[in-house]
């Protein structure tokens, strides 16, 4: 699997190419959690979001389909006793309905064959009054962003779709999810976080 193969160098490449964006978006997402929150993170990767979230929330279950990525995330969060790591499929989570206050799925929607199924699962496990947070890399008109996507695809990332800001907004509208706000960290490859609130 591509993500297992690159798990050992993923952070190095990401930090060199897009470190400013990653720092801003992870801090923003973590700021949406607090000490009373039980959080589920899907597609946690190497733990880029996991560590700052774990430092703020009550509990975090961090999941990924790639065991290599999970191993890197576990190393990164080894001093956080409130984190549990599990292998899981974002389209078929084993958690009970309405189990989490915050549900995070970063940089994964564009990789999925069936993003609607994933969105429905994220909605299912989010508690009423909770928040679903979906940060995703988007393209802008600059050459560097599109080249980055092509580079990762060439290595085997298998992007199913690419978004710019407009098409990312339209993506959620077409699926019937009302996004209360968007937050974009700008840089070489911007990252836009969609915030979906599940009303009580």
Role assignments for model-derived ranges:
Residues 1-34, 48, 72, 76, ...:
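Conserved class I S-adenosyl-L-methionine
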Residues 40-92:
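Class I SAM-dependent methyltransferase SAM/SAH-binding core
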Residues 91-103:
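A short acidic, Gly/Pro-enriched loop at the edge of an enzyme's catalytic core
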Residues 102-114:
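A short SAM/SAH-binding and catalytic strip from SAM-dependent methyltransferases
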Residues 116-128:
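A short glycine-rich, Lys/Arg-flanked "PGG" loop and its adjoining helix->strand segment in the class I
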Residues 134-136:
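Acidic carboxylate diad motif detector
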Residues 160-176:
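Short alpha-helix
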Residues 175-177, 181-200:
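Core SAM-dependent methyltransferase catalytic element
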């Amino acid at each position: 699997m591509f993500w297992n193969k690159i798990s050992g160098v993923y952070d190095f490449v990401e930090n060199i190419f897009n470190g400013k964006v990653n720092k801003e978006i992870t801090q923003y997402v973590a700021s949406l959690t607090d000490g009373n929150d039980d959080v589920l993170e899907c597609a946690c990767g190497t733990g880029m979001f996991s560590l700052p979230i774990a430092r703020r929330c009550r509990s975090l279950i961090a999941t990924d389909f790639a065991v290599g990525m999970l191993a890197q995330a576990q190393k990164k969060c080894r001093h956080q006793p409130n984190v549990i790591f599990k292998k899981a499929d974002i389209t078929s989570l084993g958690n009970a309905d309405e189990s989490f206050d915050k549900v995070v799925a970063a940089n994964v929607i564009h990789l999925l064959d069936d993003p609607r199924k994933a969105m429905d699962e994220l909605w299912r496990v989010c508690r009423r009054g909770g928040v679903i947070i979906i940060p995703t890399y988007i393209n802008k008109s600059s050459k560097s962003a599109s080249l980055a996507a092509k580079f990762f695809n060439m290595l085997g990332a298998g992007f199913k779709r690419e978004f710019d800001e407009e098409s990312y907004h339209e993506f959620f509208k077409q699926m019937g999810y009302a996004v209360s706000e968007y937050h974009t960290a700008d840089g070489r490859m911007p990252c836009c976080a969609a915030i979906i609130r599940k009303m009580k």
